[in-house]
Design a protein with these regions (language model features):
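Membrane-embedded alpha-helical bundles that constitute the cytochrome b-like, heme-associated redox core
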Residues: 1-161
Length: 161
């Protein structure tokens, strides 16, 4: 299995790691959000703890950065040979799902928070757990490529190949 795409440009690399760091950060500070959201639903002036506010604003930043990332991705798109290899097709599908979830997860959260829709909070939670599962799969695949296949895939996202 060969990785056909050339190296990523600086904007793609910076956006990748910035968004990844923000997602991981928000995931780990989200414990308080359930309580804050319930308080917020009861009284829209309540639930604004420092952590909840940071979580909401980081989520909004993620939406903006994902939009920029998609634009940069399409502007930087290189011609790729469509692979018939099962793992390469699966990787493509997982990448597309990650892009979709990187956008939708904070949109679901913002919809729940700003419009007071409890159901969207539940959707947000399910979607983030799904996305984090795909992120782990993505990370393991990158490590597999780097250390088992030794094809330099991981180095590309560090701008080294």
């Amino acid at each position: 299995m060969r990785h056909k795409e050339q190296s990523y440009n600086t904007a793609q690399i910076v956006l990748h790691w910035t968004i990844a760091a923000l997602i991981v950060f928000n995931y780990f500070i989200s414990d308080e959000m359930g309580r804050a959201f319930r308080q917020h639903l009861e009284d829209s002036n309540n639930g604004y703890s420092f952590t909840a506010s940071i979580h909401v604003y980081v989520g909004l930043a993620i939406i903006a950065l994902v939009v920029v990332r998609v634009i940069v991705r399409f502007m930087s798109k290189k011609t790729k040979i469509v692979s018939k290899h099962l793992f390469e097709r699966a990787a493509h599908i997982i990448h597309e799902c990650l892009y979709l979830l990187m956008f939708l997860v904070p949109v679901f959260g913002a919809t729940a928070w700003y419009f007071g829709i409890h159901f969207m909070g539940d959707v947000h939670e399910i979607a983030i757990n799904t996305m984090m599962s795909l992120v782990l799969l993505h990370a393991f695949a990158a490590l597999f490529h780097q250390y088992i296949l030794k094809d330099g895939t991981l180095l590309k996202m560090f701008g080294q190949k």
